[in-house]
Amino acid sequence: MPRVKRGVTARARHKKILALAKGYRGRRKNVYRIAKQAVMKAGQYAYRDRRQKKRQFRQLWIARINAAARENGLPYSKFMNGLKKAAIEIDRKVLADLAVFDKPAFAQIVEKAKASLAA
């Protein structure tokens, strides 16, 4: 068997990791062993945070809807119950957007929710 020299593949592997670590501070950007650990940790954070992002945005939307619904005299839970009874299927993202940027439209939706709760 011929002798396999691995200089080319090792260099390519090192370059790939160091390219991923570009922009890091200190030795994390130019020492392969430390850069490899930093890139691995960054990947773990990215994986975790892609899932947390969904939760955090939902929390934000609910907080905004709750604040706007309370301004119109209805707490969040009763508002959402009223929407369900009125068969209004608008998701939280759109409701939060209306609550922030189109208050009159949101107020109309709250009135419909109130009417369906009273009926």
Swiss-Prot record:
A GO-annotated cellular component: ribonucleoprotein complex
UniProt cross-references to Pfam families, sorted A to Z: Ribosomal_L20
List the PROSITE patterns. Answer: RIBOSOMAL_L20
Q: Which InterPro entries match?
A: Ribosomal_bL20, RIBOSOMAL_L20_CS, Ribosomal_protein_bL20_C
Top-level division of the source organism's lineage: Bacteria
Q: Which GO MF terms does the UniProt record name? A: rRNA binding; structural constituent of ribosome
User: Record keywords: Chaperone included?
Assistant: no
Q: Which GO terms describe its biological process?
A: ribosomal large subunit assembly; translation
Q: List the disulfide bonds.
A: none
UniProt KW keywords:
Ribonucleoprotein, Ribosomal protein, RNA-binding, rRNA-binding
Give the protein's biological function: Binds directly to 23S ribosomal RNA and is necessary for the in vitro assembly process of the 50S ribosomal subunit. It is not involved in the protein synthesizing functions of that subunit.
Q: Which family does it belong to?
A: Belongs to the bacterial ribosomal protein bL20 family.
- Kindly provide the name given to this protein in its UniProt entry: Large ribosomal subunit protein bL20
Organism (species): Chromobacterium violaceum (strain ATCC 12472 / DSM 30191 / JCM 1249 / CCUG 213 / NBRC 12614 / NCIMB 9131 / NCTC 9757 / MK)
Q: Encoded by which gene? A: rplT
